[in-house]
Amino acid sequence: MAGDVEGFCSSIHDTSVSAGFRALYEEGLLLDVTLVIEDHQFQAHKALLATQSDYFRIMFTADMRERDQDKIHLKGLTATGFSHVLQFMYYGTIELSMNTVHEILQAAMYVQLIEVVKFCCSFLLAKICLENCAEIMRLLDDFGVNIEGVREKLDTFLLDNFVPLMSRPDFLSYLSFEKLMSYLDNDHLSRFPEIELYEAVQSWLRHDRRRWRHTDTIIQNIRFCLMTPTSVFEKVKTSEFYRYSRQLRYEVDQALNYFQNVHQQPLLDMKSSRIRSAKPQTTVFRGMIGHSMVNSKILLLKKPRVWWELEGPQVPLRPDCLAIVNNFVFLLGGEELGPDGEFHASSKVFRYDPRQNSWLQMADMSVPRSEFAVGVIGKFIYAVAGRTRDETFYSTERYDITNDKWEFVDPYPVNKYGHEGTVLNNKLFITGGITSSSTSKQVCVFDPSKEGTIEQRTRRTQVVTNCWENKSKMNYARCFHKMISYNGKLYVFGGVCVILRASFESQGCPSTEVYNPETDQWTILASMPIGRSGHGVTVLDKQIMVLGGLCYNGHYSDSILTFDPDENKWKEDEYPRMPCKLDGLQVCNLHFPDYVLDEVRRCN
């Protein structure tokens, strides 16, 4: 590869002027300057050099001693490099190879011929591979080149190939401590399991015994909580650096504590447990296809805007609610198939960990609930009201993540189901829903700072305390709608309005409303093009996405609508349709490590 030659041609070279100078040059006419480099002499035209190079223009037009000289000695570049640069100035073309690019880049930088510098950068980026990465890295460092983002592109290659590069002696020799630290701190390394990054660091340290003094500092950029317990025990604790580094022993102890306290992991938010991920993925936990329940398989909306299905464990639940705590997903309640083959309200709670693509069943809620609402405040997940087939609730309970237990708190003011809940400013807002009489416009907010005592909370029949407070009602009564907080406001989308409670006759409510907590006012916004209920909602790229659901024409949807809050406009077909028509889906944005996504890519 080193001998491969590639030609580059200038697109801005003035052909008419250059042709004239080229003819004079070839005939040896009117040459008025000789440039001496090493033991070689190059004759040229001052005027041509001045038009092509800022370096020569200043030399020949400013008050410099070389202006009137006919022989000029240039130092700091090679004759080989300058001969190619001089050819470019006359002919507008240049040939580059790995054997010559170093000297040509040196000469181009010297005489400030930026176009040739760009050609050299393009050539190097096209040629970069594992075998010559260290050489290219050294070359760019030698000349401090960063034209057209060449360093960023080189770093992208390095991050994408970090582990295999760290097995190469030439790369290990050249990679500095500072560069290694910057790479280990970069979330784009997520395509490699953390244990592989640790082994790569070991290779760098072993390459030169003098590097061991950096061990404690480097180790702090390895995220041991992302490893498996087996990897920590078998590959980290057995290494010579475990005995050498006090910081490594501390990090391992932290990781082992993290592994042991399974239920508390969402609250142990520290650098060593955070996924290396630059951008979250819109994630759909599948609910219903028509009237058939689907296990909670996972769909990912991935660029270039296609849907991937994430293979892995499934949970036998059609969840009604989703809660996110530090990139862990909790799916709560909803419906599950009973032994009689019928759907029943569920008390089950499952937690999904995208780090390992794994599920864990948590403590059940105190009572089965479907069509209820949840919200996360601090270390608690609140579950509000809801129903079973035979009973409607007003009870409210909360899940303590630290001890994997549920306890009752101050109940909602009335029995209700089909409502929606969202947390804003550390308060849980509940909107709409169905009461014993009709669909509701009610908005009620739960303030945990006003909760009663433990003794009060244990009495399920207690009277309502001042924990719940009514706010201004929505403009439209609705149930089975969706609500999301965005930029300090609450947005409500779709749903239905029950007209006759006895027959459950209903009509669609396609309207959109926004709530401003500072003024306690609701404002009507542009209605959805196609009203729906049972849909999912999330925010992506400053737009609110509405996915799937049951449309008012009676058909289940696989489409995605997007709402721009700034312009108050709806758009359709901005994103590809989901691979199936879904109702009751739960949607969120999750960070996944790239090694999980790579496996998804292979399966799709």
From Swiss-Prot:
Q: What is the effect of changing residue 45 to L?
A: No effect on homodimerization, PPP2R5B-binding, nor on PPP2R5B proteasomal degradation
GO BP term, pick one: ubiquitin-dependent protein catabolic process
Q: Where in the cell is it found?
A: Nucleus
The record's listing under Pfam families reads: BACK (PF07707), BTB (PF00651), Kelch_1 (PF01344), Kelch_6 (PF13964)
Impact after mutating residue 132 to A: Decreased interaction with CUL3, especially with the neddylated form of CUL3
Pathway stated in the Swiss-Prot or TrEMBL entry: Protein modification; protein ubiquitination
Q: Which UniProt keywords apply?
A: Intellectual disability, Kelch repeat, Nucleus, Repeat, Ubl conjugation pathway
Q: Which residues form the signal peptide?
A: none
Listed under GO cellular component are: Cul3-RING ubiquitin ligase complex; nucleus
Residues forming the BTB domain are 31-98
Phenotype for residue 552 to A: Decreased interaction with RBBP8 and increased DNA-end resection and homologous recombination frequency following DNA double-strand breaks compared to the wild-type protein. No significant change in subcellular location
Select a single GO molecular function from the record's annotations and give it. ubiquitin-like ligase-substrate adaptor activity
Q: Which domain of life is it from?
A: Eukaryota
Q: What range(s) does the BACK domain occupy?
A: 133-237
Q: Which SUPFAM superfamilies match?
A: Kelch motif, POZ domain
Kelch repeat locations: 328-379, 381-426, 428-473, 489-542, 544-590
Q: What is the effect of changing residue 136 to A?
A: Decreased interaction with CUL3, especially with the neddylated form of CUL3
InterPro entries (UniProt xref): BACK, BTB-kelch_protein, BTB/POZ_dom, BTB_POZ_KLHL15, Kelch-typ_b-propeller, Kelch_1, KLHL15_BACK, SKP1/BTB/POZ_sf
The disorder this protein is implicated in is:
Intellectual developmental disorder, X-linked 103: A form of intellectual disability, a disorder characterized by significantly below average general intellectual functioning associated with impairments in adaptive behavior and manifested during the developmental period. Intellectual deficiency is the only primary symptom of non-syndromic X-linked forms, while syndromic forms present with associated physical, neurological and/or psychiatric manifestations.
* Subunit comment: Homodimer. Dimerization does not affect PPP2R5B-binding, but is required for its proteasomal degradation. Interacts with CUL3. Directly interacts with PPP2R5B; this interaction leads to PPP2R5B proteasomal degradation. Interacts with RBBP8/CtIP; this interaction leads to RBBP8 proteasomal degradation. Interacts with PACMP micropeptide; interaction prevents ubiquitination and degradation of RBBP8/CtIP.
Instruction: Report the function annotation for this chain.
Output: Substrate-specific adapter for CUL3 E3 ubiquitin-protein ligase complex. Acts as an adapter for CUL3 to target the serine/threonine-protein phosphatase 2A (PP2A) subunit PPP2R5B for ubiquitination and subsequent proteasomal degradation, thus promoting exchange with other regulatory subunits. Acts as an adapter for CUL3 to target the DNA-end resection factor RBBP8/CtIP for ubiquitination and subsequent proteasomal degradation.
Put simply, this protein is called: Kelch-like protein 15
Q: Which organism is it from?
A: Homo sapiens (Human)
- By which gene is this protein encoded? KLHL15
